[in-house]
Amino acid sequence: MKIIVSACLLGSDCKYNGKNNLNDRVIRFVAGHEVTALCPEVMAGLGIPRKCAEIRDGKMVDSDGRDMNFVYHLGVQRAIDLIERESPDLIILQSRSPTCGVRQIYDGRFTGNLISGQGFLARELIRRGYSVMDAGDV
């Protein structure tokens, strides 16, 4: 099986804070499969570390209130280009991320509150009919 996974889940230090979300359950789940890692935020050219970003009123803003919509959509498009080339059977994405969150995202006020919703990449992949799984469901 061909699986694409958020790079942070596999131990890549690509989160906004320069850390990772290494997930042993995901590592065990994908063992023995063809795995490709991706991080749409890094694919957009955003640095590590970088300002935290959340979706507010449908647009991506960073913790300084700057509009980051274009940059994040660029990363999503680059990720989709890779995904279309790879034709994966499954995509496992990082929970709560403004790009990758599948079921929940932060509320856009930088207070740590979660709301139902999807990150930019997750929403687009689901719209296109890909099989997408939240890392928390592995």
Show the residue positions of the predicted features.
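Internal, conserved structured core segments that host functional sites
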Residues: 94-105, 109
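Short, active-site-adjacent cap segments at secondary-structure transitions
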Residues: 11, 45, 98-101
